[in-house]
Amino acid sequence: MIQKFVQQIKNTVQESLDGVHTCIPGEIVSFDAAKCTAIVKPTGKFKRPDGQKVAYPQIAQVPVHFQQSSSQESCICFPVKPGDGCLLLFSEQALDAWRSGGEDFPDLKHDLTNAIAIMGVCRQPNELMQEAQDKDAIIIRQKDSRAMLSNDEVLLKRNDDQFMQMKGGEITLQNGGTVLKLT
């Protein structure tokens, strides 16, 4: 009798916890740059009360996070494409009222509809992470173009033939075969 009661309590607690979402990897389906929101497909599956595993539904109007100051005067923006990885965080409060400046916060704690996408979570590490770590630098890359900032060097590079480097009191400019060094 007591074992049945304990099992029922465990089942009830588990059912309640199954409805609480904290974070899960996701994949961008589409991105609206003007609104900075996306449709995101969470990865993985959830278990229904009958035991069946089902894929999570797509989530619409997910705010996408970029590094920026609260004044939005300083920010790092980059293209968001279908298939890009992200981490979905599920807010304790409804985001619609917060985004519109309202104060009506319905009780939807950790609901799938209150997701925020943090970009940059990928299945495989980016090879630039090791270079940034080794050089104690910030590296920004867009295909063949890159900018690197470290304590002793600034490098802007479009490709192997076009770059500008500031290092050790010297500025080097290269465009094709033409190299200009300033000291």
Task: Spell out what each predicted region is.
Residues 1-163:
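Hydrophobic packing positions characteristic
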Residues 152-183:
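Intrinsic low-complexity, repeat-rich intrinsically disordered segments enriched
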